[in-house]
């Protein structure tokens, strides 16, 4: 009988490292010795973080930590959508150019997505944007309202914004209390045995750290996976052009301006800027391509966008786009930035961490390190990353913006996968892009199924229709279904009524978050309102 894994060393703290330590100490029921080594000298990347809705279910619920416990400690706020600004046309102060990417799938009527009925109406002169017609949430988002009633009853599916450093610190305390050994030191050498497996690590202060399994959370350095084990990193800069960012925390007058319950993505001349609102401030960063603008010009554009002074503290980031050929090599598993990186346009960074941890536990080895387990794990990570890469890329090559060289290059010069080409053609023909049921309650029963079918028809519809790319024609079948069309009209009317109910019953996001911070809100005791349009989903 092969020996079980008894000792695990995690290299790197930050969000990835402490999420890994917390998840593994819980998953292995404290039956393995877990040591995390982090250096006080190596800075952690992160200026505000946006997430997706499955974070609570897959990660925090697994740890047994309710939303109301962790949110106040990490300056947590709600995210009910992503708002895309100026992605269709160059900025014009006289014009409001935005669309929302909402959570939840598109409703259907007699087996046909409501978007097809909306398109038919649009062909007849209907002007309301798709997401405003097919979802009840946008009006509440425009009003900066919370996704919950004052008593904590949830009315809209949501994800979260938070300070990633505070999350790492929160999880550090949680993990150490449960037996994780924290070492503040720096790895200076990685020793391999004659099989090419990592045997131990040498540290700056003279320690020798031995383990059966090593988790590389060292960030883009890839200290173990790339530097020591020489696993190649597959560069995908021909799929996505942005390679740099300038970021900062920006003060916000919440009482005057409110706190937006969504992430904003504001298109710029050579990239886009994120805005992640929290109480008292928002995290923001300009993601740009160094091939189309200089760092100095990008910094100037970023400061001008928010009216900031030249002495504003800034975080300059250079990133690699792509993934390791294999995320798991021998007895080393890379998690987080050491495994892969995709620009945060759809808030996938934290998801990549806990999805990889979920898959690691599902494929957890013993000391024989059966290659069938690592091969299966690696295939899952390739699927996860490439699928998300295609979805993010779809935001760029389907836009109609052509006012700068950057946007022209995105429309004409990107390398496209066969999978995304096929999705575009299916969308233009009016066909479904994914095979999932339109019933969210069955779709989201297990994370395994969500992982395999991450981006739904509704996600693609929001982006494609939002950017102005529509199917070639409304579904021909609807010409033969007058009764279905009548039913769809009733559904549109019901959505309008629900939108009005949300608009008139929800507190402002600022008031709700302030009550949560002060301990007054009945926040999220697992309650869901009867009108909730979608489960914890994308």
UniProtKB/Swiss-Prot annotation:
7-chloro-L-tryptophan binds at residues 79, 346, 443-444, 450, 454. Keywords: Antibiotic biosynthesis, FAD, Flavoprotein, Nucleotide-binding, Oxidoreductase. Changing residue 347 to A: Does not completely abolish halogenase activity. GO terms for biological process: antibiotic biosynthetic process. FAD binds at residues 13, 15-16, 39, 42, 45, 49-50, 187, 337, 350. L-tryptophan binds at residues 346, 443-444, 450, 454. Disruption phenotype: Cells lacking this gene lose the ability to produce pyrrolnitrin. Chloride binds at residues 348-349. GO terms for molecular function: monooxygenase activity; nucleotide binding. Changing residue 272 to F: No change in halogenase activity. The record marks 79 as: Role in guiding and activating HOCl. It catalyses: L-tryptophan + FADH2 + chloride + O2 = 7-chloro-L-tryptophan + FAD + 2 H2O. Its EC number is 1.14.19.9. The keyword Hydrolase does not apply. The active site is at residue 79. The keyword Nucleotide-binding applies. Changing residue 346 to D: Loss of halogenase activity. The reaction between FADH(2), Cl(-) and O(2) produces hypochlorous acid (HOCl), a powerful oxidant. Unlike the mechanism proposed for the tryptophan 7-halogenase RebH (AC Q8KHZ8), which suggests the formation of a chloramine intermediate with a conserved lysine, HOCl is proposed to be a direct halogenation reagent, with the conserved lysine that may hydrogen bond to HOCl to enhance the electrophilicity of the chlorine species and for its correct positioning for incorporation into the 7-position. This is Tryptophan 7-halogenase PrnA. It comes from Pseudomonas fluorescens. The gene is prnA.
